[in-house]
């Protein structure tokens, strides 16, 4: 009977702990800026669907997130608008790129040639997803680039924080290109 009482006491003590695992980590503002600017830079420099050779004098970045941008089949979080502070800090972090960064509210806000589907003024449009943390040092971020109707691509990037710096270590899931 004593063992049974001990067992019951253990179960009663453990019940409140069920489901009390920590929630998924939330990015700090600095992590948010670092992750987004790392992926934008990767798209600008090499993942532009032209092997990094495309001149991109204007980089339009959609300020509202869209998780379907990399892998449309994955579950989606609600869209959020990146804060002015985050946008400005991302722009500052990318100031060494030879492009003009323009933040837009939506894809439809960018002028596109109706006959060719090409973004006006040789620009490109980047759409970003929400940062999905797997733990404090590993995150996923969906993103895509649009140049024209048959020149676009998207994927989900895997990032890891190494020695305090967020780096892309690979991709996961569907990668698409048109």
Language-model segments: residues:
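Bacterial N-terminal signal peptides that target proteins for export
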Residues: 1-8
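Flexible low-complexity loop/turn motifs enriched in small/helix-breaking residues
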Residues: 20-140, 144-152, 174-178
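Short beta-strand edge/turn micro-motifs at domain boundaries
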Residues: 154-177
């Amino acid at each position: 009977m004593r063992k049974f009482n001990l067992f019951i006491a253990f179960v009663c003590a453990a019940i409140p702990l069920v489901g009390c695992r920590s929630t998924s980590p939330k990015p700090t503002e600095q992590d948010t800026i670092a992750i987004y600017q790392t992926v934008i830079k990767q798209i600008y420099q090499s993942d532009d669907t032209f092997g990094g050779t495309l001149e991109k004098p204007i980089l339009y970045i959609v300020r509202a997130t869209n998780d379907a941008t990399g892998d449309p089949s994955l579950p989606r979080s609600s869209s959020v608008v990146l804060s002015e502070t985050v946008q400005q800090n991302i722009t500052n972090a990318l100031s060494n790129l030879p492009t003009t960064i323009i933040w837009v509210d939506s894809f439809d806000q960018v002028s596109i040639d109706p006959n060719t589907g090409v973004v006006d003024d040789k620009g490109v449009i980047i759409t970003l997803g929400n940062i999905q943390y797997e733990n404090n040092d590993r995150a996923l971020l969906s993103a895509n680039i649009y140049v024209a109707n048959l020149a676009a691509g998207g994927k989900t990037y895997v990032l890891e924080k190494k020695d305090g710096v967020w780096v892309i270590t690979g991709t996961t899931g569907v990668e698409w290109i048109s």
